[in-house]
Design a protein with these regions (language model features):
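Interface-prone segments of viral and bacterial extracellular assemblies
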Residues: 50, 54-57, 73, 159, ...
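Short aromatic-cysteine micro-motif
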Residues: 112-238, 242, 269, 382
Length: 383
């Protein structure tokens, strides 16, 4: 039997088993590190010689049980690991493992488990979330650094591409985005990002690597403050760059709907426009919630007879005439007062995208929400 723990910047790999198995896993990890080092040198023009990166990793291998079991604490009740997970095509994605947390631990709510950890009625001890905005390889999405994020695809086409990777793979869900946003708020590390044409609007020195002929930046190319916990190992680019799909929340004819808990992660959950996977978002007493838009003002309430229009404003100017732990778990509230809230409550269906884009300035952010987006839309600013 053998054990190994490899660390490379924010990426780690742990393996335990027969020596041959552990050796193969270590070799695969070191091969990825070498490729990453070469990509970094090529894309960043780094002066530092990274050719000996595998040797650096070898020197960091830890074989004692205590070190292997140790995990980094990121917030009360929340832990994560960074791991490489391979899909059915044999290509890795860099993923965070988040461990189960309750609403009480996360934002002072009830003792209920956060909905991101409840899938198909089963409570999971852990879930995995992409570290990077996804890029496309042979029609499948992957979480990899220093890549161009995928755009010009509809949410449903993107979701199906994710499901095609094999069991467990899925598009980022609204419940999972809520977990990330609530965790950032709890930590006091609301992420910065590409909000001003490859720079952060709050400090022009914070910038990512710009993609030629665009204002988008390569995935994970910004500083540590561009992650959910302000560490190099955090989840990147939740603020700005491109709007991101958050599958499982919509507004239809002014009413708010969501997939139950994190069932948007399941391919069998029917989230077509008339699908039975949609459930009303409710207040603390179980009343369905609606969004009224009148005179460029947005109000969340329980009244079905609402004024229907469309507009956008800062979350700090949104009226919340309801008490809903579900909205809090989904991070649909003024966690960032300047972040934008855009709503279309007119007739029809509009799905949720989040985070803001490269030109949204202070209106971008992990709490920025856009319920203004028909499911048939595809464009260069979201994906």
């Amino acid at each position: 039997m053998a054990k190994i723990l490899c660390n490379y910047f924010g990426l780690s790999m742990a393996a335990e088993g027969k020596s041959e198995f552990v050796g193969r896993q270590a070799a695969a990890f070191l091969g990825y590190v070498q490729q990453d080092a070469e990509r970094c040198a090529e894309n960043c023009g780094c002066a530092e010689d990274l050719s000996d990166a595998p040797e650096k990793i070898k020197r960091e291998i830890l074989r004692n049980d205590e070190e292997l079991r140790r995990r980094e604490q990121t917030a009360p009740g929340v832990e994560h690991d960074v791991v490489a997970i391979y899909d059915n095509a044999g290509i890795p994605s860099i993923m965070h493992r988040f461990r189960r947390v309750t609403n009480k631990e996360l934002f002072g709510g009830s003792d209920a488990v956060h909905p991101a950890f409840i899938i198909g009625g089963e409570v999971y001890d852990e879930i995995y979330i992409s570290v990077y905005e996804n890029t496309m390889i042979n029609g499948k999405p992957y979480s990899l650094p220093l890549q161009e994020p995928v755009t010009n695809i509809t949410m449903e086409d993107f979701a199906q591409a994710c499901f095609s990777k094999g069991e467990g793979w899925h598009c980022l869900t609204a419940a999972e985005w809520g977990l990330l946003a609530d965790t950032s708020l709890k930590l006091g590390t609301l992420p910065h990002g590409n909000t001003n044409c490859s720079h952060w609007h709050g400090d022009d020195k914070e910038q990512g690597i710009i993609i030629e002929d665009s204002y988008k930046t390569l995935t994970g190319s910004g500083p540590a403050t561009w992650t959910h916990d302000h560490t190099a190992s955090g989840v990147h680019d939740l603020c700005g760059n491109i709007w991101e799909f958050a599958r499982g929340v919509r507004i239809r004819d002014g009413a708010l709907w969501a997939a139950e808990n994190n069932d948007a992660a399941l391919p069998e959950t029917d989230l077509t426009e008339c699908g039975d996977g949609w459930k009303p978002i409710t207040d603390a007493e179980g009343h369905p919630l609606y969004v009224a838009v009148e005179d460029n003002k947005i109000t969340f309430n329980t009244y079905p007879s609402i004024h229907r229009d469309y507009c956008g404003c800062a979350w700090g100017n949104v009226r919340m005439n309801c008490d809903s732990e579900q909205l809090r778990a989904l991070a649909l509230f003024a966690g960032e007062e300047k972040a934008g809230c855009y709503v279309d409550s007119t007739e029809g269906e509009y799905i949720l995208i989040r985070g803001g884009g490269w030109g949204y300035g202070g209106h971008a952010g992990v709490f920025s929400s856009y319920l203004y987006h028909p499911r048939s839309n595809a464009g260069g600013s979201f994906g």
